[in-house]
Amino acid sequence: MRPLIAIVGRPNVGKSTLFNRIVGRRKAMVDDMPGVTRDRNYANVDRFDVPFILIDTGGFEPETNDRLLQQMREQSQLAMAEADVILFVMDGRDGLTPADVEVVEMLRRVDKPIFYLINKIDGDKQETAIGDFYTLGVDTIFTVSAEHNRGVNDLMDEVIKALPKGSAADTDEEVTKIAVIGRPNVGKSTLVNRLLGIERVVANPTPGTTRDSIDTYFTCNRKRYLLIDTAGIRRKGKTTEKIEKYSVVDSLRSIERADVVLIVIDAEEGVTEQDTKIAGYAYEAGRGCIFVVNKWDTLTKDNASMGKFIEKIRMEFKYLPFAPIVFVSAKTGQRLGKIMTEVDAVMEQFARRITTSDLNRVFSTATEEHHAPLYQGRRVKFYFATQVGTKPPSIVIFTNRPDGVHFSYERYIVNRFREAFGFTGTPMRLLFKGRESRKRA
């Protein structure tokens, strides 16, 4: 396992900017609105001598009556409990605050390496105006400017030295990456918390409470997974705030990172137009897909109700006939075990490779039983097929008229491959090439 480093501190002291600087890319949302990073956010960092996981937390307010800020405080405490090293960030422009002092007193009781940072120190003049911070009585204080990359490299040199030795980095290939997507407030965060057995993501009845995509590693039945709880994808017309627009982009990026996507649908509201668009993102990205119908416990059901809901999904999501459907209640835990069973099954098919001989046996039979329509009055001839990739399964078919294969015939070929080999839960990619490309296949 990679060692973990947690960044904690009051809201708006620059934690997310520091997170982005260390990661080397824009991973967390940065905005001037206090509390914009509501949950912990994880990123793998490989830029330094020791690979590690960096945790960005929501702002830490020691005493508050605001329920959301209280939840963010609890999440910060969980992050500190998980971490191997803690970076406590203070604001050099605001000066030392009573909240900073209270957090430092709490950190004194934590038995792990802690680095105290004064952020937003952009020059020597500011460096001389931070005397109050030295009254904290800590051994070393680092002055940095995360925005301008001042002092960050020196800080990281010392942080790397403090990381536990012998922590082997896990490669992405060893981990099944699962993205949880859906409209705001369909129960994604509650579902994630149930799967993990811990209040990992702030679950709040306010739609859009989860704004960033939140990453969590976990183990189930001796298999490792990375669970990505994405911000709810809203209609474009509703993403009026700059921060919400970035959340949609972040969710789409999370889909790109995933192997398997859980498409969460609200059983109470049924299938909406926005659900079909969200699922379309996953399909276009070529990810393994599973429908998770949540809040199934809230409906009055008869023996036919589940069948009717399945028919509705199949009708509205005609491009995903291969995706399994699981009916669950994240609130009660009903049928949640079925989700991981389906994830494993879909992942196996997502990464499946078929031998060229088996592929062509099915392909030849399919083309002989049903010829392709004529193209510009000429017959479309097929030569052979070969699988060139996985995740998703990708197959090249060599033909005399690569531009003459009708989409309906392409769908027919895909269906024949599915009948023979399964490929449950995963899209398939067919690429038609001219005969002259055969040697390059």
From Swiss-Prot:
The keyword Lyase does not apply. GTP 1 binds at residues 9-16, 56-60, 119-122. Residues 352-436 form the KH-like domain. CDD domains: EngA1, EngA2. GTP 2 binds at residues 182-189, 229-233, 294-297. One of its GO terms (biological process) is ribosome biogenesis. The keyword Iron-sulfur does not apply. Gene3D superfamilies: 3.30.300.20, P-loop containing nucleotide triphosphate hydrolases (3.40.50.300). Keywords: GTP-binding, Nucleotide-binding, Repeat, Ribosome biogenesis. One of its GO terms (molecular function) is GTP binding. Residues 3-167, 176-351 form the EngA-type G domain. Disulfide bonds: none annotated. NCBIfam families: GTPase_EngA (TIGR03594), small_GTP (TIGR00231). GTPase that plays an essential role in the late steps of ribosome biogenesis. Associates with the 50S ribosomal subunit. PANTHER family: GTPASE DER. Belongs to the TRAFAC class TrmE-Era-EngA-EngB-Septin-like GTPase superfamily. EngA (Der) GTPase family. This is GTPase Der. It comes from Geotalea uraniireducens (strain Rf4).
